[in-house]
From Swiss-Prot:
It comes from Sinorhizobium fredii (strain NBRC 101917 / NGR234). This is UPF0260 protein NGR_c07710. Belongs to the UPF0260 family. Pfam families: CxxCxxCC (PF03692). It comes from the Bacteria.
Length: 155
């Protein structure tokens, strides 16, 4: 058991900060704007990314201070991961919370932060910045691919 990776031996609550942060695969999916139907609670995804998400490297441009710039940025915690229904099905936090293993393309498994992009999981090249887009126009950017990434094997 000593040679098993930490995500197979620890719960989210038991992880160090460094282990916790490394569970993020860098896909950027959680930083896409989502719309919620007030009647049904259904979540609809858009291709509109947060103003702080870099569309190419799929990382936050100001991670440490993100909530000062984007007050509604969701801070992932073990409790939040267990409660948030919209985390992508491939999310490392979600997978570990559900007792499942990380995918082959996750940087912790592959050893390479580029595999999440090469496997077609990330938002790289598929988004537009939210800056200048009116909220009433968000429906023009509805997409389903965030819930479909990772379902088909990459050729």
């Amino acid at each position: 058991m000593g040679d098993m990776p930490f995500w197979k031996t620890k719960s989210l609550d038991e992880m160090t900060n460094a282990e916790w942060e490394s569970l993020c695969d860098g896909c950027g999916l959680c930083c896409l704007n989502k719309l919620e139907d007030w009647d049904t609670g259904e979540i609809a995804w858009t291709s509109i990314r947060c103003t702080l998400l870099d569309g190419e490297n799929c990382r936050c441009k100001d991670y440490d201070n993100r909530q000062a710039t984007v007050p509604d940025c969701v801070q992932l915690t073990p409790k939040a991961v267990r409660e948030i229904s919209w985390l992508p099905p491939t999310c490392g936090y979600r997978l570990v919370a559900e007792g499942r293993d990380l995918y082959w393309w996750h940087p912790l498994v592959s050893g390479d932060p580029e595999t999440v992009h090469a496997a077609g999981i990330s938002v790289r090249g598929r988004t537009v910045a939210e800056d200048g887009i009116e909220i009433e126009d968000y429906e023009d950017y509805l997409v389903t691919w965030p819930l479909e990434v990772g379902l088909e094997p990459v050729e």
